[in-house]
C-alpha cells in the first residue's frame, strides 16, 4: 500500500510512472483471479485504491500549475 505522503513527494512524471506500474500490477492480479490462482483477493481492492490515490494526487498537482 502506497502512502499519500510518499506520493506527494513525487513529481508529475514520477506519479505517472507509479500509476502505470500500479495498473500493470492490477492487471496481473485480475488475470490471477480469473485463473483462480489469486489467494488474497483483498489485494485487488488495495491496488485499485492505490491507483485512485495516485490519480487524485496527480490531478491536484496538475491543477496547482
From Swiss-Prot:
Pfam families: Ribosomal_L29. SUPFAM superfamilies: Ribosomal protein L29 (L29p) (SSF46561). Gene3D superfamilies: 1.10.287.310. Keywords: Ribonucleoprotein, Ribosomal protein. PROSITE patterns: RIBOSOMAL_L29 (PS00579). GO terms for biological process: translation. InterPro entries: Ribosomal_uL29, Ribosomal_uL29_CS, Ribosomal_uL29_sf. One of its GO terms (molecular function) is structural constituent of ribosome. It comes from the Bacteria. HAMAP family: Ribosomal_uL29. Belongs to the universal ribosomal protein uL29 family. This is Large ribosomal subunit protein uL29.
Amino acid at each position: 500500500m502506497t502512502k499519500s505522503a510518499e506520493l506527494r513527494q513525487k513529481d508529475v512524471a514520477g506519479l505517472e510512472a507509479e500509476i502505470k506500474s500500479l495498473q500493470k500490477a492490477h492487471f496481473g492480479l485480475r488475470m490471477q483471479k480469473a485463473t483462480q490462482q489469486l489467494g488474497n483477493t483483498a489485494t485487488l481492492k488495495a491496488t485499485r485504491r492505490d491507483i485512485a490515490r495516485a490519480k487524485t494526487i496527480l490531478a491536484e498537482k496538475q491543477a496547482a500549475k
